[in-house]
Each structure stands twice: as C-alpha cells, then as structure tokens.
Regions:
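A short aromatic-anchored loop/beta-hairpin motif
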Residues: 1-128, 132-188
Length: 188
C-alpha cells in the first residue's frame, strides 16, 4: 500500500521549459514512489522502429504469428535495454508482478510477453524499454521547481492509441489548455 502522499498510480506531466529534453512533453505513469525514490514509465514516446512481432521472434518464443500486437515505448533513460510491461490488473505473474493499484500493474518478466503474443495476458498493456528513475527527494524537488504537474491516471490516456495527444489529454484532466502554458514559472 502506498503512503497518502505517494504518486504511485498517478501521471506526471512534463511542463514546458523543464530543462531536460528527454522528458519534453512526456507523460509518465508512476509505478513506485517512496522515501527511497521513484520509478515511472513514459507512456507517450513510442519506439516506431521496434515491432512487437519482431521482438517475440528475437526472443525465440514459439507462438507463430503473434495473436496480439502491443506498442513498444521509450520508458525512460535508465536501463533502456530492459523491458517493462505496464498493464491492467487483470493479469498477474506470481512473484514478478508489481501491483501498483487496483487498476494498474507492472511485470518485467518474459512470461507476460509470451502470454500477450499468444492472445492471453492482460486486457490492456504497453511495453516500455527503460524506465524513469529518481533518487530520494529528487522528484519532489523537480515538482517544487515546476518541472512536473500530477494528475490521476486514466486508462484511456495510459493505454490509448494516440501517443501524440496523451500530453494534452492529461493536461485537460486538470482543466488546463496546453496552449495557455508558459515555459517559465514563478511564485507570487
């Protein structure tokens, strides 16, 4: 169970002018957040050169043509050779699935990929290569410096097909028009 002020299961929305081009217009689903740090997956930066069917073949799964295709995303700048499947909580791999909340889970083992390729597994999923990580207090400091906004996660944003509109859709959940945002911030 997460602490009351935990961002687990929430979305981070990158603010214009945050200063890190790797996160420009990013929407990050927060999988873990505690005093020790935070881990999230960018859900709106696809890796169009990578195809799920080719990955399944490369991994040597004997499933024929995959029964299902999921999109592959750039999850963040840390360990970008490692895969993480963010998915609906209707799937669980014993001992290897992190239940983020009642709606979302994350699995980082090969079995979930094989299940998806066979047409089984979670009803909604995306594969992220790499993750976004923060040390103790680092994310909180970035939020205080107006680098990020936070909002509740919605499946239609997290698992939605149109990656180009996820950033503006997340902002709209807060009642913010993306065209009205400034790249600079201040305090009165």
């Amino acid at each position: 169970m997460s602490a009351p002020d935990s961002l687990e299961g929430k979305l981070l929305i990158a603010m214009p002018g945050m200063g890190d081009p790797r996160f420009e217009h990013s929407v990050v689903f927060m999988c873990a957040h505690s005093e020790e740090g935070a881990l999230g997956l960018i859900v709106n930066k696809p890796a169009p050169e990578l195809r799920f069917a080719a990955l399944i073949e490369q991994l040597g799964f004997d499933v024929g043509d995959p029964k299902r295709e999921i999109r592959i995303h750039f999850g963040g700048p840390v360990e970008h050779g490692r895969g993480f499947v963010l998915h609906s909580s209707d799937y669980r791999s014993e001992g290897s699935t992190l239940e983020v909340d009642d709606s979302y889970s994350m699995t980082a083992t090969m079995d979930v990929l094989e299940q998806i390729a066979r047409g089984d597994g979670p009803s909604s999923a995306l594969l992220a290569l790499g993750y976004s990580g923060w040390g103790p207090g680092q994310l909180e400091a970035e939020i205080l410096q107006n680098g990020w906004l936070t909002c509740d996660a919605a499946p239609e944003i997290v698992f939605g097909e149109n990656d180009e509109t996820k950033w503006s859709a997340a902002l709209r959940t807060l009642g913010i028009d993306p065209l009205m945002l400034s790249g600079t911030a201040g305090r009165a």
